């Protein structure tokens, strides 16, 4: 078996996507999640996954690795450094190659990219094996909640006096500033990716504080704010903009994001649990809803 860096190529991006799909479908089947194990591939999601792999291969080549056995890609890890925070964006091994040390070698290689970083952050699947590996790597695992369902428009409360408006590249300084306040590090070039691939960016900027939220279809992809009041306003606005008939979903909510749970319940979303938000050298960011792909 050999480990090599992920190349910024269509072939490597497709290899990573194939491994991830196989690994996550197998996990869903083993954990009894029939909806995820049988879910068809969505073209838009596939395009985003391929583009994200190539994006990280460009921004963080030392943090993105593929494991190959007899010429076949059997595992992958995508990670990044953002201002002193090491972030593991993806860590997957083909089901047939699991339990053979592939994951350990991949994680060690990716973690070397974060050498010197005092803090670490990742969104973990419900995989018991992955949870053990992250805990051994020094991460604290915070059980995560999910919100899902159709938005009950009658539950959308009066938004109050905090204005929310569409954002864009001109707000990059504000976005990075809010990131640093919430999680201790800016997303930097990842904002360029999200602006290009998600439906919209919502921004709130007042004398009392600032915040932003990315929405893509029914998914709240990332939310950060300097106060719970602004975060609540942004989440309500994002859910109000979910197209009629589209399932809304919000993932990786820790206990610190009770404000988000309250908003979701107000609009009729169902509360569940899935996976973990794992942190090292830091508390879970708050008020904050992490991006599964960029944290």
Predicted regions and their residues:
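Conserved GNAT acetyl-CoA-binding A-motif
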Residues: 88-89, 113-127, 244-254, 273
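Conserved acetyl-CoA-binding loop-helix of GNAT-fold acetyltransferases
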Residues: 90-93, 99-112, 136, 228-241
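A short, internal acetyl-CoA/4′-phosphopantetheine-binding micro-motif in the GNAT/acyltransferase core
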Residues: 68, 91-98, 219-231, 252-254
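Amide-forming acyltransferase catalytic core, primarily the GNAT-like/NAT-type
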Residues: 136-218
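Conserved catalytic-core motifs of GNAT/GCN5-like acyltransferases
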Residues: 121-123, 140-154, 271-282
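Conserved beta-strand in the GNAT
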Residues: 64-66, 72-80, 87-92, 206-221
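A short beta-loop-alpha structural element at the N-terminal edge
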Residues: 2-18, 25, 162-174
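Active-site rim helix/loop that mediates acceptor-substrate recognition in acyltransferases
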Residues: 20-64, 68-73, 180-200
């Amino acid at each position: 078996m050999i480990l090599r860096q992920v190349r910024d190529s269509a072939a490597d991006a497709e290899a990573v996507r194939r491994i991830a799909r196989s690994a996550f479908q197998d996990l869903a089947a083993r954990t009894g999640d029939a909806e995820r194990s049988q879910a068809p591939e969505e073209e838009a999601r596939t395009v985003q996954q391929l583009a994200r792999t190539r994006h990280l291969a460009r921004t963080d080549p030392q943090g993105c690795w593929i494991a190959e056995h007899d010429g076949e890609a059997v595992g992958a890890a995508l990670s990044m450094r953002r201002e002193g925070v090491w972030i593991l964006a993806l860590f997957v091994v083909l089901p047939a190659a699991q339990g053979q040390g592939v994951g350990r070698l991949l994680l060690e290689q990716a973690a070397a990219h974060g050498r010197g970083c005092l803090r670490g952050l990742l969104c973990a699947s419900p995989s018991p094996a992955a949870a053990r590996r992250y805990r051994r790597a020094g991460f604290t695992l915070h059980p995560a909640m999910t919100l899902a369902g159709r938005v009950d428009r009658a539950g959308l409360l009066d938004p109050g006096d905090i204005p929310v408006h569409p954002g864009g590249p001109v707000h990059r300084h504000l976005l990075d500033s809010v990131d640093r306040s919430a999680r201790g590090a800016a997303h930097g070039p990842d904002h360029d990716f999200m602006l290009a691939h998600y439906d919209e960016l919502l921004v709130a900027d007042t004398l009392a504080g600032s915040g932003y939220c990315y929405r893509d279809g029914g998914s709240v992809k990332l939310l950060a704010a300097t106060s719970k009041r602004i975060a609540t306003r942004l989440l309500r606005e994002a859910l109000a903009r979910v197209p009629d008939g589209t399932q809304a979903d919000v993932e990786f909510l820790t206990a610190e994001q009770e404000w988000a749970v309250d908003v979701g319940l107000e609009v009729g979303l169902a509360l569940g649990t899935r996976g973990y938000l794992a942190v090292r050298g830091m508390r879970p960011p708050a008020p904050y809803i992490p991006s599964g792909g960029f944290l």
